[in-house]
Amino acid sequence: MTFSIRTVKREIRILGLDTCRINEVLGAVVRGGYFLDGVIRVRLPDNHAARDLASEILASKYYPELRAIMLHDPGRRLKPSLLEKVARLPVIAASRTNRPGRRDAAFHSAFGTLFHQSRLPKSVVDKILSLTWTCGGLPEPARIAHILSKSTLNVQHGRGFGPKP
């Protein structure tokens, strides 16, 4: 299955996913690199994680406007190819370090070097990364999802800060 994004607009909607929490994935829907449109939280069992996550993405209200998924998965808990197949969206697996034994493509910017893997053409991925990387060590979709994942934000009820459930 091949995906194509014909034009990459300034306000492309990207779903950034972070898997730093145990049995939970937090996502941020970001428009370009400047606007946060929404937050997605999915509790995942250990088995069938990518398939369950993809079905939750398909059921979300943000799905019709999403153009790609940016995955920050330092523990390699999800299979990007399976997520891409079930969600029917291209996946950009982004990391600050190159994975051992893999030759991921490198993207260089003023903020540093980012290694990525995707089935999209390198020119399209580079354009998406240049539009969404505005500050910090990761592009905004993955960075916001990572901040949410590392915070003590109680996303269950959509309110305030509090202890993790």
Spans of model-derived segments:
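Two-metal-ion RNase H-like nuclease active-site motif
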Residues: M1-R21
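Long, charge-dense
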Residues: D46-N47, Y62, L78-R119
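Charge-biased, low-complexity intrinsically disordered regions
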Residues: M1-T2, V42, A49-A50, A54-I57, ...
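Charge-patterned, long linear interaction tracts outside catalytic cores
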Residues: V124-P165
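Short coil/turn connectors at secondary-structure junctions
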Residues: K9-I12, P64-L66, A87-L89
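A glycine-rich, hydrophobic loop/mini-helix early in the fold
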Residues: N23-A68, P74-G75
